[in-house]
């Protein structure tokens, strides 16, 4: 991509530290000839998309939650994002707050490199009419309400029936979201570059529905076959939709829907270790070669 000439900074709303840091970064960028605009909180999708259209980079100051909100509103625009981590995990907002200057110096010194990933696009249909459409960065979760009862869902893939599922819920996750709720439900970790998404049940009745990986172009349809129990769809853990019996959610991959500025350096495995998703138990194996007497070492 071309060198960065303009930056939109989006801060976590109501976070004085983020706003102060945004002012510091804005001054730093202006001194280097880069135009800058600061927005407190992502707000509504349309104004954010309009502001981001003129930016070569959207810099997000907050944690992974703030990154999710911004990335979801900008899904499909192709505008690259970079997160400065003021939160905890920092799997999406990967730049430590104390390293912002060195990171931006590197980004301004060469053409920007980006990593494009799959997002989810979904619609909710009620009585044959689409009542909601949206995008998801991490996942769409269909689950029960306050009562501790299983729900029943009918699942189709590409127009073919897959199964009727009785479970606490269902997680449809992107590769980016595989390290979120899905991995807690024993879904697979996925390389973010994969053109695929997962369908993972939450506590399936009798355990008869393993996690399923679908190609990014697949269409997964989930119909609510439940009477008298509250059912909700939650998008990225941030937005919710109340569902009724007979409602149908249709989901598919949005190729290149997410765009992140990449810094190089550590790869996916290094990030998994750094964020605690895998543990590296170093060990020394015994010498299995025969000794000079022709006998092998006992193990």
Curated annotation (Swiss-Prot):
Its EC number is 2.7.1.23. Its main location: cytoplasm. Pfam families: NAD_kinase, NAD_kinase_C. It is found in: Cytoplasm. GO terms for cellular component: cytoplasm. Belongs to the NAD kinase family. This is NAD kinase. It comes from Nitratidesulfovibrio vulgaris (strain ATCC 29579 / DSM 644 / CCUG 34227 / NCIMB 8303 / VKM B-1760 / Hildenborough) (Desulfovibrio vulgaris).
